Amino acid sequence: MIAGLGLSTCTPSDVSIPGAATIDVMNGFPDGESGYALGVSGCYAGKLGDFLLMAGGCNFPDKPVSEGGIKHYYKGIYIARVDDSSSLRWVKAGELPMEAAYGATVSLPDRLIFIGGSNSSDRFSSVLSFSFDCMKDSGLICETLPPLPHAVDNMSATLLGDTLYVLGGNRNGIPSSSMFSLCLDNYSAGWTEVPFPGRPRVQPVCSSLLGKLYVFGGFTSGGDASVSTDGLCYHPESGQWQVVKAPLTTKGEPLTLTGGASVSYGDVLLQYENNTSWQRPSKPTL
């Protein structure tokens, strides 16, 4: 699952996806930093081999923001082996270079890539690649990839072929309609900005499917504040965009996936939005 990362906690009950899979609640949460076990928002997370890995994130450990609480950011990196058990045993495997949240994570077969993010004082353009090395004490090795041209947070990211895409979010603190690409087979060439149509999209949902890139939802704040329900499909071979029909609720109403997540499952997208309902469209419809 990609994250543009929302909340890291699961729903309180099992969720059934007809014809696809069952989503089960897993027990266990990292507790290597004071306040972390309360649950965090905006963490970096993904699956690496037989392990889940999560890092960073933020919360209000002392009191909620409505009561004047102060948001705290974290930098711990935690891993847990995935097996047949319903419990996860987390071990702290290292730390990020800085406290961070609200970035994006992309999972590759042999590594996880953490992109951008922010904390209470800074916004980041950094791109970090994590992989396993059994010769290391923690097992984790971190490599630095070319940074984004701008600091970006609250965006989404996905891998399409050998190209990494980062879309939307806040660019240097301002809601953005930017998209950047990085070829992982030639990453020394750096990032390229890809023309992106339409309004800015902060906290969009982005995924790749059948050789195309899809983006849904997102919001923009300020005087022209709005929440997007429609989607867009990008064809990398032609560089063209097409409008995609909005996903619908069970009542047939347009649904925004802002702050949610999606994952490709065969030839469908499983789309998750932040009121914990799952959508399984038969295929994205152009």
Regions found by a protein language model. Name each.
Residues M1-A3, V244:
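Terminal low-complexity, poorly structured segments
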Residues A3-I17:
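Bacterial Sec-dependent signal peptides at the C-terminal "C-region" and cleavage site
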Residues D14-L286:
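Kelch-like beta-propeller repeat domains
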